[in-house]
Amino acid sequence: MNQINNSTLTFQCETGNYHTFCPISCVAWLYQKIEDSFFLVIGTKTCGYFLQNSMGVMIFAEPRYAMAELEEGDISAQINDYEELKRLCTQIKNDRNPSVIVFIGTCTTEIIKMDLEGIAPKLEAEIGIPIVVARANGLDYTFTQGEDTVLASLIQRCPSKDRETEKINKNNSSLFPSLSIFSKNKNESNLSQDKPNLPLVLFGSLPNSLTNQLEHELEKQNIKISGWLPTKNYKELPVIHEGDYVCGVNPYLARTATNLIRRRKCKLISAPFPIGPDGTRAWIEKICSIFNIEPTGLDEREKAVWDSLENYLPLVKGKSVFFMGDNLLELSIARFLIRCGMIVPEIGIPYLHKRYQEAEIKLLEDTCRKMQVPTPLIIEKPDNYEELKRIEQYRPDLVITGMANANPLEARGINTKWSVEFTFAQIHGFSNARDILELVTRSLRRKNYIQQLGWKELVE
């Protein structure tokens, strides 16, 4: 058995398979976030069954996504992929007329080497609708990384010039060529007066209520957001210039961050993620430090949140929680729960990008030191069989796991919580810390209720 280090985090990597949801499930929240989009998932019947069951949307609701089901003729190359996709996209254009069509590649398109990147530009020119290709296959990516691949593909579609300024300059240059330079300088001076800080683009798909909350928190520190990726409408993608600052709000967007740095020459703000009051405060403080702003009011804001959690903290204090690894939110949630008084012996995580999560890892270490608890063992790509043996040895009070392992663990008398619930719950910002603890304590309270009824044989 591996010993837990009390001072620094210990990282290990096993050779286990991904025990997660398929990454094409990102369609579930992205098609609702980008309201003028249409997602076309290109896969097999299995992909279709998964989407239909996981999303729970009936066909008569006409959702803005669909399945392009591959048949034997596609796999044996007897059917022309371009003509079939052209037929489907033309039908989508006539029926829904979206601003963008997103091709979602699956495991099957990877295996048969379907050239979606080669087909998309030709098809886009022919039907007149932008087509973005995202490979969200379960061979290479985990559950939430599907969003990462979509956002990484959208980066190249973000404009490098402000649309209104470009339109004004174009009209001025055509009507009054001699005034074009003067107009450009005037616009630049006005922009510099309106924006005291450098442009800041936040990336990560969150409900509109959460984006408004985070924007409001930054506006209190006199920091204005220049854009979000993704946006409510495809035509409103943020303007990204070389040298702009970017900051992520979710731990699973490493590919998006890399593309912003390498392709658009942006400067990444490495900050902890705004999950829990401690993470949200650290996130704001890091952004303020980049813009040389002294943050104000954060002590009172964080204290008020912790005071509001007084009813939950006694339920979790001293309890142990084990993370089996599913949605890449494990480090952030574990850090918050340790701050609440819980003990985390092990964190399983399907994939860990240490550079992108560097600040989160540092905050996790500091939190363990502050709470005077052992640092957890972090295992990347955990082997499921070995993981279950360690759970039997630890006997934690709660295991946060994927749906596949929940019932077997419950049968062994171990409390579980589905990790997918944290993916779809609103857990970001100061005001949503209560929702995290509500999810965590629900299983603990349920066991207490059953024991009070005298049904101990069901849980022991």
From Swiss-Prot:
Gene Ontology cellular component annotations, sorted alphabetically: cyanelle
Bilayer-crossing regions: none
Molecular function GO terms recorded: 4 iron, 4 sulfur cluster binding; ATP binding; metal ion binding; oxidoreductase activity, acting on iron-sulfur proteins as donors; oxidoreductase activity, acting on the CH-CH group of donors, iron-sulfur protein as acceptor
Pathway: Porphyrin-containing compound metabolism; chlorophyll biosynthesis (light-independent)
InterPro entries linked: LIPOR_BchN/ChlN, Nase/OxRdtase_comp1, Protochl_reductN
Positions annotated to bind [4Fe-4S] cluster: C22, C47, C107
Record carries keyword Plastid: yes
Protein EC: 1.3.7.7
Subcellular location(s) per record: Plastid, Cyanelle
Enzyme's top EC category: oxidoreductase
Cofactor(s) listed: [4Fe-4S] cluster
Function statement: Component of the dark-operative protochlorophyllide reductase (DPOR) that uses Mg-ATP and reduced ferredoxin to reduce ring D of protochlorophyllide (Pchlide) to form chlorophyllide a (Chlide). This reaction is light-independent. The NB-protein (ChlN-ChlB) is the catalytic component of the complex.
Family: Belongs to the BchN/ChlN family.
Protein name: Light-independent protochlorophyllide reductase subunit N
Originating organism: Cyanophora paradoxa
Top-level taxonomy: Eukaryota, Glaucocystophyceae, Cyanophoraceae, Cyanophora
